[in-house]
Amino acid sequence: MRIEKDKELMNILKIMAPGTPLREGLENILRAKTGGLLILGDSDQILKLVDGGFKINSEYSPSYVYELAKMDGSIVLSSDLKKILCANAQLIPDSSIPTFETGTRHRTADRVAKQTGAIVIAISQRRNIITVYKGGIKYVLRDSSIILARANQALQTLEKYVAVLDRVVNNLNILEFKDIATLFDVVTAVQRSEMVMRIVSEIERYICELGNEGRLIDMQLSELIKSVEEDGILLIRDYCRSNMEYEDIYKQIQGLSSEELLNLDGLSKIIGYTGVPLVDTLISPRGYRMINKIPRIPSNVIENLVANFNQLKCVMEASYEQLDNVEGIGEARAKAIKNGLRRLREQIMLDKV
């Protein structure tokens, strides 16, 4: 459900993450301080720009790439990264393509990437950095230790944000069962949920860039967030105006800037409440989020329940017979729903104490 930002960049980072044969070859060139220019792709459009060099047509290996980079020209790899096609080749892109790069190697890489849409990697001999180009994208690969430090810092921040979200949601749970939740409580929970998901997106990018070195970070992340996004979406479904699509609302919230996300009035407008006081407006949940917490209740049954009763309070007050009349709910499921909601309420009230 998250909008896939920088999807192309994420795919590039996966290809050359630490632990991959390509990254190993790049690191070898970097350590040797020879510099290098690699193009990933063997389409006719790319091969038309290749002039001279040696036809290698050999299986890819990090050590082969390292040895071939000692020559001045560029190295052309196949699209699947399984073969080295040629080495010591000269790339001749269209010189009218604008570029703001300075070094010859980087100017060529930028132009070839813009002209062909292929991934081109320039390794600087003096600055000792790896720069990746694709279309209009330019990205400097960072050392794993730097990314790891940033990922750990982001995890610590996430931990604090999740703790605040838990407090806000637990408070909302109590208010929902008492049917005294206000627009302020709801919008605060939506805001906090989105804040957490933004940090998660940042950590996921670090994990992608770390490759096999990011496994522990990934495990810690999974443990921390569990069902945060799902609960956030159900929260929107519980409280948005009935004539609005919850998916569109979720996308709108994701599109907000950091400053806009801090504006609770703006968030309340997005979920359909315009010109009403946040603290004084009482709203009742439909029950999607709470009923979802009851085990073994299918989503179609939850949809039918909400369509029939429209409010969590009405579901809780309904008799076994009234629940039984809902499509997909028999006597056993009616008991499971009643008992499940009762246990949930008791648990939430105990947590408060």
From Swiss-Prot:
Q: Write down what this protein is called.
A: DNA integrity scanning protein DisA
InterPro entries (alphabetical): DisA, DisA_sf, DNA_integrity_DisA_N_sf, DNA_integrity_scan_DisA_link, DNA_integrity_scan_DisA_N, DNA_integrity_scanning_protein, RuvA_2-like
Q: Which PROSITE patterns match?
A: DAC
Q: Which cofactor does it need?
A: Mg(2+)
The enzyme's main class, written as a single word, is transferase
User: What does the UniProt record say this protein does?
Assistant: Participates in a DNA-damage check-point that is active prior to asymmetric division when DNA is damaged. DisA forms globular foci that rapidly scan along the chromosomes during sporulation, searching for lesions. When a lesion is present, DisA pauses at the lesion site. This triggers a cellular response that culminates in a temporary block in sporulation initiation.
**Phylogenetic lineage:** Bacteria, Bacillati, Bacillota, Clostridia, Eubacteriales
Q: What is its EC number?
A: 2.7.7.85
The entry describes its oligomerization and partners as:
Homooctamer.
Which family would the database say this protein is a member of? Belongs to the DisA family.
Keywords (alphabetical) are:
ATP-binding, DNA damage, DNA repair, DNA-binding, Magnesium, Nucleotide-binding, Nucleotidyltransferase, Transferase
Which Gene Ontology MF annotations are present? adenylate cyclase activity; ATP binding; diadenylate cyclase activity; DNA binding
Give the catalytic activity.
2 ATP = 3',3'-c-di-AMP + 2 diphosphate
Q: Which residues form the DAC domain?
A: 6-144
Q: Where does ATP bind?
A: G73, L91, T104, R105, H106, R107, T108
Q: Name one GO biological process term.
A: DNA repair
